[in-house]
From Swiss-Prot:
Coiled-coil positions: 62-116
UniProt feature, compositional bias: Polar residues: 31-52
Keyword Transport: no
Naturally occurring in which organism (per UniProt): Homo sapiens (Human)
Annotated segments matching region Disordered: 25-65
Protein location: Mitochondrion
Gene name of this polypeptide: MCCD1
Summary of the tissues where the protein is detected: Widely expressed. Expressed in adult and fetal liver, kidney and lung. Expressed in fetal brain. Weakly expressed in fetal spleen.
GO (cellular component) term, any one: mitochondrion
Top-level taxon: Eukaryota
Protein name: Mitochondrial coiled-coil domain protein 1
Keywords: Coiled coil, Mitochondrion, Transit peptide
Transit peptide: 1-24
Amino acid sequence: MVLPLPWLSRYHFLRLLLPSWSLAPQGSHGCCSQNPKASMEEQTSSRGNGKMTSPPRGPGTHRTAELARAEELLEQQLELYQALLEGQEGAWEAQALVLKIQKLKEQMRRHQESLGGGA
């Protein structure tokens, strides 16, 4: 059972998922580098003239790979979010069972007191 979260609009849901770039492997570089300033410095220093120019792109393959990686990361985060919701649901069920057990113990204690009260 997944609980509806009406306050979590699509925009906010996606905003929560988009910081997923931190899930990229630490050794990866390039467009998804953890240090965009260093990436820009690499681009300008490789040109030699100090002017900011965009790196040459192939026929969309780099962009396609980037989108595929982003989609993969979003899917991973969605799975984690669903597991979190299921875990929360399980925690609520466990808490409800604990409360039921406590209530039954209290009823048993009262019943035993009423039976043993005359002795």
